[in-house]
Amino acid sequence: MKVELSKVPILGKDVVHVGFDIADHIVDTIFQSCPSSTYVVINDTNVEKIPHYVDLCGELQAKLKSGSRILQYSVKPGEAHKTREQKAAIEDYLLSEGCTRDTVIIAVGGGVIGDMIGYVASTFMRGVRVVQVPTSLLAMVDSSIGGKTAVDTPLGKNFIGAFWQPQFVFVDIKWLETLPKREFINGIAEVIKTACIWNAEEFARLEENADLFLQVVNGSKTTQVSVQGQVHELSLTNIDAMLEHVYRLVLESIKVKTHVVSSDEREAGLRNLLNFGHTIGHAYEAILTPQALHGECVSIGMIKEAELSRYLNILSPTQVARLTKILAAYGLPISPDQKWFKDLTLNKKTPLDVLLKKMSIDKKNDGSKKKAVLLETIGKCYGTSAHVVSDEDIRFVLTDETLVYPFKTLENGQEKTIVPPGSKSISNRALILAALGEGTCKIKNLLHSDDTKHMLHAVQQLKGATITWEDNGETVVLKGHGGSTLQATAEPLYLGNAGTASRFLTSVAALVNSTSSQKSVVLTGNARMQERPIGPLVDSLRENGISIDYLNKEKSLPLKINTDSNFKGGRIELAATVSSQYVSSILMCAPYAEEPVTLALVGGKPISKLYIDMTIKMMEKFGIYVKASTEEPNTYHIPKGHYVNPPEYVIESDASSATYPLAYAAMTGTTVTVPNIGFESLQGDARFARDVLKPMGCSVTQTETSTTVTGPPVGGLKPLKHVDMEPMTDAFLTACVVAAVAHDGKEGSRNTTTIEGIANQRVKECNRILAMVDELAKFGVEANELPDGIQVHGLSSIDKLKVPEAIHSYDDHRVAMSFSLLAGMVGATKDALSEPVRILERSCTGKTWPGWWDVLHTQLGAKLDGSEPLQSAVKKNSNSSIVIIGMRAAGKTTVSSWCANALGFKFLDLDTVFEEQYKKGSVKEFVAEHGWDAFRATETKIFEESVKKYGEGYVLSTGGGIVEGAASRKSLKQFASQGGIVLHLHRDIDETIKFLNSDPTRPAYNEDIRNVWERREEWYKECANFTFYAPHCTSSTQFNQLRKTFETFIRTISGKREVKIPTNRSSFVCLTFDDLAAHKEKIPDITAGCSAVELRVDQLKSYDLDFVAKQLSILRLASSSLPIIFTIRTKSQGGQFPDDDKSTLGSLLSLALEVGVEFVDMELTLSSELQYSLVNNKRNTKIIGSHHDFDAKFDWNDSEWENRYNQALSLDVDVVKFVGTAKDFEDNLKLEQFRLQHTAKPLIAINMTDVGKMSRVLNTVLTPVTSSLLPSASAPGQLTLSQINEIYTLLGGFSAKNFYVVGSPISHSRSPVLHNTGYKILGLPHKFEKFETSSASEVKDKLLSKCKLGGLAVTIPLKLDIMEFMDELSESAKLIGAVNTVIPLGDGKFKGDNTDWLGIYNSFLANGVPENVRGNSGFVIGAGGTSRAAVYALHQLGCSDIHLVNRTVEKPHDLKKSFPSEYNLHVLEDSQQAEGISGSVALAVSCVPADKPLDDNLLARVRAVLAKAQGTSFKPTLLEAAYKPAVTPMMKTASDEFSWHIIPGSQMLVHQGVAQFQLWTGFRAPFNAIYSAVTEEQA
């Protein structure tokens, strides 16, 4: 297909040329119209990969005239390079090439290139000619036209620039062939915008072609092209398939912009109409960039600004609905809360205050006043420029939570006429009848809502009718085909929460014809829709020959209707006591049955008979006459036939919706008229004013077609003793809120209004009766349910209405609209300012009255505001309870108690709760008496009650079979989906079976245990969002290690422990074992000095999920919970994992998140699906975005790295890791330049090969290293940590520092051997020596003045004296009152710290003591300096009380006075006090000299306290602070007499020294080697 070349004038010149494949024309025009000595083509490096660019440059070169030259300059792609610095670099290049004022610059690229190069042209030589060749849709229709040029600054986009009109803008649509799909759709937003503000005809054309566009763009394919010897992957779209459409949309959009620019070049007024959608859109973009694109944010902005126009009573709801529909149809977001868009933007929050702040710096604002472009109708703006809008109104449209203020601002005698939207009931019936009918029918006043949108879409999917629009979208035109064209579709009919549509379409589906490839239709909806009943209708259709399957829950959607089965007709019996819609559904489809239908309604009195009458009357209008049986009650005869569509059908306004403005009049004492609903209405709810409001004290005037209500003075409504609302069940909610403020004035009266006949309201969008009871209670209004109704007990005064907590709408339009009325009555009669009432989910009113809030605000005068959403009850890092699931004997009870202890939660075993409720023995006895099924049902009930009752601050341990029940699984998944933790505790199944077979206390399974596991395994995975693999422990050491590992794990996944990215020089070691089990003893030495450890999953011998989980468990235990980097390196990225096994890869990456690893390496070459799955489900895990160039394809200046870096930023990874391949040494220098220019995220950037080793030395964050203990390095050129440090030292990166231990006597000090061992192993150049002195002044004079001082270890007697020379003190040093560590700060300043307490604290942790020992007391023996550190450490461990004993009693009292009262220190002066201690003492620290006999009095008190160790969840533990002798008298007493676990003093010594080492060097010390060196020396 060919399209003609079009020239569009701007400012009087034919500047814009639009065509397809016009490279020849571009070149000829430039050379003919812009003669020059120098032409400079400037583009970004991405464009160079496109063949069309090569063709264009080739044409320029081939046709260049003699005496002229062509230069070419490339810039790096992306907004990050649209800077003043880049502009200067371009200008320097032009100057260096001798470019003069006759230069012509040709800008080839997207918006970034066009903006920046235009600005270069505007200032170079005071202005040179520029030609724009836009290559993206957005640039073609927007940025290239109009002469706006700019660069970005750190403070904002486009803040520095100029207006500089190009000589030409060449729009060659061929560029769009290689535009990626998302970029294509992104540009469409601006196209829709221009049509929306200026060209209604083009807007309608865009509506008609939306399906074609999305079909073609979604069909784009990736292809490989060779450009100048290099192969590149490009997206390729078949533009030919929609060339006419794309050409037109580009051309028409350009015409709008050129016209506006020609009228207002400098944006004095008219031109800012082009900013429709941008005021709010730019605010979203500022927060969501770079994940969200400009057009995507403008799309959301257009919706919000259209809603703002509707809110201000300027734009009709129909026009908003059209705009919403077209944006969605072109694949653009219409709300920031759409799941796919939230996933794309990584679930970033868009806080209301931040959005408003971003809007405040919009260039078109009037000072502090915000301006927005308002829409009058599709194709026309309101006025000729942007309008000032209030923050209050903006806030309202930006949020789904609204604040309703008291109705105080009403005019006296206010009279309003309100026209509600078309009836939902009539709208849906009319659409079905017209679709089944023959001929064209124009339907007017159709309700434009979610329900009707789903119905229209379904009719189109089934090919039931041809649908067009007239009157600018206000009138829908259906050309029905008499049902003959109904056709099965493979795509499920998604109906949201549209109950009416679902019921009507179930019968319509029975008339659908099969195709050769499709034999069924599937109806589905949202979660609530899949709970609502449809059973009676399905039963009747099944009995009539229609084959229907439930695909999920019985009696609810989704349904699968077999289209090969026929609707036979004849007698049909239907239970109609739940919903009249079942009846209407069969009635409307009955004429198309094979035989005439007799429909008998059975099972009791039919509900809502007036709606059945409505259907029958409407069928008459379409030519089918239904006769009621004269012989049988509630029975109808429907003849065979075809509907004949009337030329026009006008939908009556919705009578249910009309109840809200009428009730508003009743409650506020004002007058409201609804002009198109009267007593002749088809709808039962038209009776509401006459049968409900009038008896309650209102004046009601009703004609055939109108209803007027005037309320009594405020507070004058009377309760209604009894009303049967069966003819108008939907209106009962409105009646309830009116009744809430109705009273009879009698003292002691309950002011009761009784409403009956509404049982069907329990199965609507929610259980409406219960919802009204619950939400009325929040206002202080009592209500109670009746079998088929509700009683509301009104308040004696409106002043008694309470300001409730947030009102929940249950995603139910009628609940929200009803409570919007009662909300305004709170405080309405009080003079003082009253708080507003918050209503949640306000947008649910879109189901029937999208503009209800606009009417309430603009027409009825209510004050509304928007508000930041309340936080969900269950949030990450909250005290949300944790549920633990797993097989019997997995260790749930033990681990749950650890979990509770670590988090400070309470522990609840649901088996224990069961036994308490059962009160007849154990679970085993219950099962023996009642069976497993009864137990499961009871267990599920208890679980659901417990989750609700103990939702915060608890650890709930469940029975192994909790996942057997579907209801329990649903509750577990719901809890997890709200941010709660459901933890699957997993053990080796063989070990579990072995244990269970030997345990007689548990009820026996009726089947093989392994079979039970195999059945439950998937259920555990389905319900849990975290997994912990607990290996079998064979010793107390392993058990303690497991506890410590678990506590670190649970604190990490719950957010109590932050995963930190190192900020100093750091490294991780890359493990290359194929199975860690045989090498776990080596892991502590392999990981020495490293900040993390990488598990190369691709190098493991098996990718089985259980095997990998075990490997992770081994690694956690062996490395003492060192942060794990989980890496699966694919073959294309230099690893061993198959590139094509995406399924296993996805499962393994999911496992990584489920087991809570600290880091996941995510290759930037993975599919978008996997990448977004990772980043959106990462929880507390950090993501490393990695890219490797093993084949040395890309120089560090190549755009590949820039594009990958921008990709990493758009994915918002936590760390970027780039690995190149060095061919020569200069590659390292280029890498360092790249590192300097890319600082937005922590960057690991290295080169492989021996030549690239230097880059590993210079890398700062998380450098990958190997170890001599590993079988091989994981990459070419990889170094050990000590090698890196040694080379870095040789380069001057590390300066040798001198460290000293100071004090006296220190001849036996182990500090030098401790620290020097660490320095040697890690390759550090430092030296540690002794400096013996008793004078702090001497230390100051001789050591603190040394320039190479690295730090001091301070011992007796200087721990107090040295403090006067410190400039800063750590919190621990202040409270302990002593310094044992001096840290130089530079400039002659020093910080004093204390690591003695860490020596004590970490020694306890290393010996199985949990991080928090809540409920247990501590014990300190002695009252010297070390005792102070012991007190501090025990408090940090969570000891509830700390008991002190000393040989003399004065010193411990002094010690007690120096600590805060919350430490709960108790001095035990005698044995009687010691024996009187209540509670358990679990930790003790001995700080008395070990080389002298113990005082008898002191020993007696010690023994009394040690005897108090009872009932702890860990073995009571005593730490001996003295490290000589190896076994002290105190150690023997505690161990031999009281069986306490003993920690020798050498451990405290090493732990406090290791803490110093890490403070001074920043490196994690090699603990095992240091400990061996210290203890060997000691021996």
UniProtKB/Swiss-Prot annotation:
ATP binds at G886, M887, R888, A889, A890, G891, K892, T893. The keyword Cell membrane does not apply. NAD(+) binds at residues 44-46, 79-82, 110-112, 115, 135-136, 157, 175-178, 186. Signal peptide: none annotated. Zn(2+) binds at E190, H278, H294. Pathway: Metabolic intermediate biosynthesis; chorismate biosynthesis; chorismate from D-erythrose 4-phosphate and phosphoenolpyruvate: step 2/7; Metabolic intermediate biosynthesis; chorismate biosynthesis; chorismate from D-erythrose 4-phosphate and phosphoenolpyruvate: step 3/7; Metabolic intermediate biosynthesis; chorismate biosynthesis; chorismate from D-erythrose 4-phosphate and phosphoenolpyruvate: step 4/7; Metabolic intermediate biosynthesis; chorismate biosynthesis; chorismate from D-erythrose 4-phosphate and phosphoenolpyruvate: step 5/7. Keywords: Amino-acid biosynthesis, Aromatic amino acid biosynthesis, ATP-binding, Cytoplasm, Kinase, Lyase, Metal-binding, Multifunctional enzyme, NADP, Nucleotide-binding, Oxidoreductase, Transferase, Zinc. The active site is at E267 (proton acceptor), H282 (proton acceptor), C844 (for epsp synthase activity), H1188 (proton acceptor), K1217 (schiff-base intermediate with substrate). Its EC number is 4.2.3.4, 2.5.1.19, 2.7.1.71, 4.2.1.10. Residues 404-862 are annotated as: EPSP synthase. Homodimer. This is Pentafunctional AROM polypeptide. It comes from Lachancea thermotolerans (strain ATCC 56472 / CBS 6340 / NRRL Y-8284) (Yeast). The gene is ARO1.
